[in-house]
UniProtKB/Swiss-Prot annotation:
Cofactor section: Mg(2+)
Keyword Magnesium set for record: yes
Protein name: Phosphoglycolate phosphatase
Gene3D superfamilies named among the record's database cross-references: 3.90.1070.10, HAD superfamily/HAD-like
Keywords: Carbohydrate metabolism, Hydrolase, Magnesium, Metal-binding
Function noted in UniProt: Catalyzes the dephosphorylation of 2-phosphoglycolate.
Gene Ontology CC: cytosol
UniProt catalytic activity: 2-phosphoglycolate + H2O = glycolate + phosphate
Taxonomic placement: Archaea, Methanobacteriati, Methanobacteriota, Thermococci, Thermococcales
Binding site for Mg(2+): D9, D11, D180, D184
Amino acid sequence: MTIKAISVDIDGTITYPDRRLHEKALEAIRLAESLGVPVMLVTGNTVQFGEAAAILIGTSGPVVGEDGGALSIKEGKLRKRVYLTNMDEEWILWGELKKRYPEALLSFSMPERKAGLVVLRTVPVKAVRELIKELGLNLIAVDSGFAIHIKKPWINKGTGIEKACEYLGISPKEVAHIGDGENDLDAFGVVGYRVAVAQAPESLKEKADYVTTKPYGEGGAEAIEHILRKFGYLPEEKT
């Protein structure tokens, strides 16, 4: 197996628990880039957030935002945004959800979003899923650990990575993905190598080829270095 790119979740994977970027993860990402391995930031957050992070961190790969619904492709000094869907039934769900649960709140990032709703965790994800079923909507609700992402069933990190790979000219099987949440499962389904960070749910760890010993950003750094060593970009550590 050959790995030509690394895709990595942001929140909880290359950050501290409070979402500050972890220094060790930053160093590891820049090490990968210096070795010719493009890093793709893959997030449930907005594509604009991902773009800003990519610029500050220094990643060269595409940005996958909105859980796979939006991409940002680097073209020279400019970036092109690609949206894989739009919202319709999502707003029907939101109207009914707000009626039944007045405490329901949308993410402050909604004005920038085009591919799905993000509801804060003031409402149980189970209640959202039950309402989707009751209304007969073709939507799913995924708990990222930070918020509830409501979207079309075919919009996920896996489809976003597949689209990003078209622009890179590589197969998704030549990508190693690192994540820490339920919304990373679809990414695990399309890539060639899978790493779960230590605090990830068991559902993700069960599908991983490697689980880090350290959590959060320190675990993200461990994951990147593990991938670089396993696939020959760095020498194996002596035991």
